[in-house]
Amino acid sequence: MAKEIDINKLLAQENNALNTILSQVNELCEQNKKLQGLIEIQNETKELEKEHNRSLPWFKRLVKTVSNVKYIFVKSEEQLTNEAIKYNNKILKDIDNKIYNIAEKSAPLKQELQEEIEKNFKDLTKKDLSKEQRERLSEVYFSYKSKPERFSALNMTNPLQFIKAEELEKQYNSLNATKQNIQNLISENSNIKELKEIQKQVAEIREEIPYTFFEKLNNIWQNVKNVFVNNSEQVLAKNKESNTRAIRKIDEQLYKTKHKFEELIENKERNINDIIAKLPDNEELQKIVSNLANHMTSKKEPILTTSSIAKPLENNVTPPPPLTKNNIPPPPPPPPLSKNNILPPPPPPMPTMAPAQTETLSKPVGVTTTVKKLENQPRPSIDTSDLMREIAGPKNLRKVEKTDVKTQDSRDLLLQSIRGEHKLRKVEFDPNTGKPVAHSHSKPAQNVSKPNGVASILARRVAMEMSDSSSSSGSESDSGNWSDASVNSNKPKALKTRGERDAKTTTHAQKILSNRSSQKPSFVRS
């Protein structure tokens, strides 16, 4: 209730402007009185002039009267000349601007105005009108909802303010009419399911600045045409001709609108450049000029995004290091010695390459053979640490004597085992008590190539032969001097003194030495 009181006060203050609107409506009716229906409207206008109470209901009656005048002009447009049409549109435009200027002063009044215009439009479209007349009426209807001040009052600072707002307003009205034509076309072909989804998208387009409005509407229109092309068999026969005319007309409207936008943008660019040329040079101004140039370039020639540029394939495999001559990798440094400076045993010898393979490697690349390059494959690494240890070798090397395996007998194998430093412990007996004497472990022979070592080996060999002969015959066991001699427990043995045993051993050893003095033993170095 309080809102209506405020609206009534505002209308009372705008009494002169409202009277001017009534006089302009009477003028239109008088100039076009030959058109059917204008006499009734003129009578309604006189009724409004007689009422001095300017209230909200009175304002709604005024808006409805103006809407009826537009309806008659649209319905009877064929009876008017081009000059009459231009004159009528000019007067109607002035009336619309005055009504909007009054409504702008009160938000509740502006809302009431929008609701009343929408209601009148729906009522008028239900009347007997052709398709072209409904399209024309939609253009007139949307002229109610726009005014030049809305575009000239954009949040921009001078001199970037839109000076020719009327041109933008015309494009805005044209786009609204095109939107309505698209909706009418979709409604007439509601049997196509794909168009129902597009119809929702068209209805959801918000009123905004004309150029973005055009972009959204144009994208949706392209989808509509694609639906008609892909579903041509679903189009009813009675709608084919009307659809063709409607599509052609909408295409022409969008083309003209786009061309006009491009012209306005080019003119505005020239105006901005002229204004900038008159200003003093500074860094901020140069940034504005650069941004403007980039913006205009992006509009005319879209720049490819970074995502559209093909990137080179990334290879995370690191290439192997280049090989040295003969394709043999350089050996790594030798491993550090242990605490006791003892190197591990040498590894087995490296496998040798086949002759064919060595010939292939020795030939130059590209002359007689072609070598395929392995890409993105790691080359096999060769561990040469054992090889270096073998080359370095231990500090004290021992000469290894070559022996013929075929000519070796059991005795030679025994001598080799003795050279291998098998530890035999000699047991000595006390001549007084006849008991073994405890000694510390005897050190093994360290150098088998010395002459005194040969005599000791012969003595051990004689002892082993005597032990074997005595154990096989069962007469006696010569195990007095060795700890590992076998004892025959089946026959009793006669105990001998140490002197007898030593004399027998010495005599037997001398016989063997005399027999072999003429030939060189196999274990003595040549």
Swiss-Prot record:
Feature: compositional bias, Pro residues: 318-352
Query: Where would I find the WH2 domain in this sequence?
Result: 383-400, 410-427
User: Spans of biased composition, class Low complexity?
Assistant: 464-480
Q: How does it assemble?
A: Homodimer.
**Polar residues: bias regions:** 481-491, 506-526
Protein name listed in UniProt? Arp2/3 complex-activating protein rickA
What task does this protein carry out? Recruits and activates the Arp2/3 complex, which in turn leads to actin polymerization, promoting Rickettsia motility during infection.
Recall the GO molecular function terms of this protein's record. actin binding
Q: Which InterPro entries match?
A: WH2_dom
Query: Region (Central and acidic domains): which ranges?
Result: 448-484
What are its GO cellular component terms? cell surface
Signal peptide annotation: none
Query: According to the UniProt record, where is the region Disordered?
Result: 305-356, 425-452, 464-526
Compartments, record wording? Cell surface
